[in-house]
């Protein structure tokens, strides 16, 4: 799809707030069981190896999974189930750079969560040092939460129903049948 076709999409072809919320709920349901298995595996591995590396890899895995799904398939599992696609200005799946920009708030939030999560373990100097940063990461998470809320609320009030992260990345969430 070229940029000209993007201009001809109707307002109803762009996915609104509540349908995106439903996609997020589906994501949680679809990913929950595998996520719990990965969590249990990586955390038990961390304890048995006396290393935080498996826990850090767990956080990295979920970031990479999100980015991969957007670049390769044009959406998260929930979006794909609901026949939505994430596209860029050229009407194609987002590039790696666009997917990274699109997920910047989630990546930052995950880093803060990782710092707090790893600091709960007392395995090596890594967790001891991260424990020093945990209060700051926790406070920054509290600041990031309302920013992420505003980010998602943009969908309800912007032309083409774009979240702040969509605007930053140059992406759109559209009905699959429209492209």
Where are each of the predicted segments found?
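Membrane-interfacial and juxtamembrane segments of integral membrane proteins
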Residues: 1-179
